[in-house]
Amino acid sequence: MENLEIEKTALVVIDLQKGIVAGEHAPYTGKEVVEKASKLVKAFTDKGAFVVLVKVSTIDGKDMLKPKLDSEINQIKRPEGWDSYVPEISNIKNTYAITKRQWGAFYGTDLDLQLRRRGIDTMVLCGISTGIGVDTTAREAFQHGYNQIFVEDAMTARSREEHAYVCKYIFPRLGRIRNTEEILEQL
């Protein structure tokens, strides 16, 4: 992989917030993902790259999607502070925060606008969950024409199978898959 063009590349970190990271994940724990993602955030900000921290939140629950489904959406508990970014990334300067109300980070946010205004054509994606927030954002990014790099060891899912499926069958159709060390070497 060639070096990343920092001025045209953004790191997009999905849902590394207290209420999501605390859940059970595989193949990596929330703690492992936070450790890798925080290294990426620090490295990207040190190089002056655009870093976007995305979280899901609700004002009163009425602003969230509620479609009719065959299976129940696994509702996360929402104690006070559930939607706060984890401390490892919450106080890093020069990051841009986006709040979404659904799985993907594009719909209903200004993510595309902010990326285009900065001349960004490549997104490096990480976060939780591989098969929900990261995957949906990746599909939306693909539809918007962005190049994508998925940091496989800086994301995780509810199960090994979900993570493996998305990384094996979906992400290769949308972009390139790398690990944290490979990305850090390309900065």
Swiss-Prot record:
Enzyme class of the recorded protein, top EC level: hydrolase
Database matches in SUPFAM superfamilies: Isochorismatase-like hydrolases
Enzyme Commission designation: 3.-.-.-
Domain of life: Bacteria
GO molecular function, one term: hydrolase activity
Record keywords, A-Z: Hydrolase, Plasmid
Similarity comment text for this entry: Belongs to the isochorismatase family.
Name of this chain's protein: Uncharacterized isochorismatase family protein CA_P0030
